[in-house]
UniProtKB/Swiss-Prot annotation:
SUPFAM superfamilies tied to this protein: EF-G C-terminal domain-like, P-loop containing nucleoside triphosphate hydrolases, Ribosomal protein S5 domain 2-like, Translation proteins
Gene Ontology CC annotations of this record: cytosol; ribonucleoprotein complex
Chaperone as UniProt keyword: no
UniProt source species: Methanobrevibacter ruminantium (strain ATCC 35063 / DSM 1093 / JCM 13430 / OCM 146 / M1) (Methanobacterium ruminantium)
Role of this protein: Catalyzes the GTP-dependent ribosomal translocation step during translation elongation. During this step, the ribosome changes from the pre-translocational (PRE) to the post-translocational (POST) state as the newly formed A-site-bound peptidyl-tRNA and P-site-bound deacylated tRNA move to the P and E sites, respectively. Catalyzes the coordinated movement of the two tRNA molecules, the mRNA and conformational changes in the ribosome.
Signal peptide: none
InterPro entries in the record: EFG_II, EFG_III/V, EFG_V, EFG_V-like, EFTu-like_2, G_TR_CS, P-loop_NTPase, Ribosomal_Su5_D2-typ_SF
Protein's name in the database: Elongation factor 2
In-chain residues carrying the UniProt-annotated modification Diphthamide: H598
Amino acid sequence: MSRRDKMIAKIKELMYKPEYIRNIGICAHIDHGKTTLSDNLLAGAGLISEDLAGEALGMDTKKDEQERGITIDAANASMVQEYEGEQYLINLIDTPGHVDFGGDVTRAMRAVDGAVVVVCAVDGVMPQTETVLKQALRENVKPVLFINKVDRLINELKLGPEELLKQLTSIIVEVNALIKSLAPKDKKNEWMVNVEEGSVAFGSAFKNWAINIPKMQETKFTFKDIIDYCNEGKEDELKQLLPLTEVLLNMVVKHLPSPNVAQVYRVPKIWDGDIESEVGQTMIKMSPDGPLAGMITNVAVDKHAGIVATCRIYGGTLEKSSEIYLVGSHGKARVQQAGIFMGAETIDTGKVPVGNIAYLTGVKGASAGETICSADCIIDEFEPIDHISEPVVTVAVEAKNTKDLPKLIEVLRQVSKEDPTIKVEINETTGEQLISGMGELHLEVVTNRIINDKKLEILVSEPIIVYKESVLGHSPVIEGKSPNKHNRFYIDVQPLDKPLYDALIEGDLKEGRIKTKETAQDFIELGMDKEEARRVWDVYNRSMFINMTRGIQYLDEVKELLLEGFEAALKDGPLANEEAVGLKFILSDAKLHEDAVHRGPAQVLPAIKKAIYASIMSANPCLLEPIQKVFISAPLEYMGNCNKDIQNRRGRIIGQETKGVIAEMDFEVPIAKMFGFAGDIRSATGGKGDFSTEMKGFETLPIYLQDDIVRQIRTRKGLSPEPYGPEHYSA
Ligand SMILES: Nc1nc2c(ncn2[C@@H]2O[C@H](COP(=O)(O)OP(=O)(O)OP(=O)(O)O)[C@@H](O)[C@H]2O)c(=O)[nH]1
């Protein structure tokens, strides 16, 4: 039996022993070395040749990933590791670090129980380090820390033992400060990383060595010895003495939870169903014989196998040829293959029990975020996966040959399934297909893949910024009349209170129609008036619909219609047909026709929509634009050039710090002004500057620009150039 076959046999055995399983994600800021680390772990496990690790990029399986040298999709692999005489199954996911692909990280975190957070020893904690930690901790995923590129501190920066220790300690302190502020309340202390206990390792993924305190105790190696080995040109020996795979995976096995431990606190957080039910108990007790409960966290399309879904099995067993039910889309499908991932390959094991990360094929309707269960035992859905960022840039695409239009529609449907952070819409007026994504690079990758992988010739427009609509003031009470004039709704609007708005952005408050009274308490804790808090009917697009009427006959019967109308109105605001956000609507009175026939959808929907539009237009409507945080690090003499470039982009200076001869600068810049930034900053710093970006959120567009931008958007969308005033909607 080859080493690989033996490993597959072992994996099949360990799959059934949850205490010997670890599901982990590797995540970091871009370029800090996740993929090099994952590749070396794969090589250590015999999954790719050791010579190719770091070059072959076994986890970066797509051609564009290898060409660009960055990870775009999350990739998976299962491997076996021995720790203290026992063998363990490690299911690993490598995730992208670039801000544009944050959606993959969030989804990967739903599949795992632990995360190896990789931080570059030279750069330290960077913006995406904070974002990925936030994504992990929000999903109740426990972190350990690997400080990578320590070889550079020794070989390039020539640090001695004391300075080395100082630099490493400052990174650990910063990471722990983040864990303390972001971890779930009951885990804050337990989850901070600890050098003494060995939940922090240091090393070089590139040179294939790593060390932590347990390894120091075992080998009697010190940082001084490591520095000496590097200085004496014996770095290659370090990988024999301090093998990266062993140190890293031992840390994972010892400090990250097995699924049977993690599911006890993760399932109640990510699943809304009744924990005491049969399904709930199957998940908590990790029973492979109970009802199937799984969540699809990623979907890819393979030329031969069709849709290949990644699925975390939370209960029961996924079986080949079985019929499963897709809870969100209400579809049924027959599983063709069920097995595990091994980098670029999949191994069909026929069955995958609870606690593992599986792949499955044959599920045509699968999309990331979908709950799956057995067709004869339907379960409650898992919580939707919240994405921290949201689309900020759009491109219009059209098929080069009009005969390809049906194919384009099909391909776009597939693309949005593979990547739920992509939004695909059709502009009803112009017939254009619009793809919105997290940034220019994200859309470039998506459209290139349509051309190269899906073999479809398309024309792609210049990127268009996504704006949002909101209000600055408080409208008077507006009357919305139904077409038959027998139904009238009286509402007003004002900006939603900031603490509530922020909590919705952070995902601390969930959106949706309010079903239980308990939610009111969360609103009250954020400063909302008690009476209003108890009367919230719906939270949608970071806006609230509050019913403050009393004793209106038939109101409950039209409630669903009112909320449908409210949500539809916010999808396309009255100013520029962009989404409306951050609004608080109060319904203060209503008059309804006593006969149900006269208060149906055709009457109620237009009445509420008109009232919403008129109220927005009378409350000083405004546009919000997406803002990016930009961090530039460059030699001091280029600081002036950088500031000038940023100011030309309507940017703001947030902070500047000098570290030796290097200036570290923080800015905030509208995304509308970021096009071409990479090239410009390269020339502004003589090629010596580095930069990274992070999404800040949406902020009010300067008022002097608003009329022009509104006109531009409306004209592009085929609407009249000027928006209608409130009187237009009260006719
Ligand atoms: N000197 C040194 N270079 C390293 C080390 N680890 C990674 N690198 C280099 O750093 C660069 C980025 O490494 P990757 O592994 O692609 O980084 P990543 O975090 O996966 O990047 P994305 O996938 O694009 O987010 C590559 O040029 C690596 O060769 C290390 O330990 N030491």
